[in-house]
Amino acid sequence: MSNREVIIPKGMEIVYERYRYCPGIKIGNTLYISGQVGRDENLQVVEGIEAQFVQCFENVKKVLDAAGATFDDVVEMVTYHVVGQQATEEAQPFTIPHLQLFMQVKDRYFTNQFPTWTGVGIACLSMPGLIVEIKCTAVLDLD
């Protein structure tokens, strides 16, 4: 079996120490990134829908950078979106709230290579106020 390398970017040590999970694990040339949410280095939920989407992608970027990868290396993205009563009112043509805005933010980060993507609507996330979680898998070049 290939070596297992734990990836803990600067500023994310608190999630490992407090919650006992790794932001990323690299095995061989495959990087598994834990679900990243819209909270800052102090574990405070970022206010504002677009700001929270941006923070999620910035957190994914921190893990990618720490592992020597980029968004071009991401082959799979799974996103979990909190849905609620507002979903039926605001989410046309999608059932996930704010999905159009999420896709606009996503496109700022994925500019060359696009990953597979599964978007899932859920009832809630781990902390009040969180609206999305992004989990990625990346395959790095073996150079």
Explain the meaning of each model-derived region:
Residues 1-76, 81, 85-143:
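N-terminal presequence-like segments and the immediate start of the first folded domain
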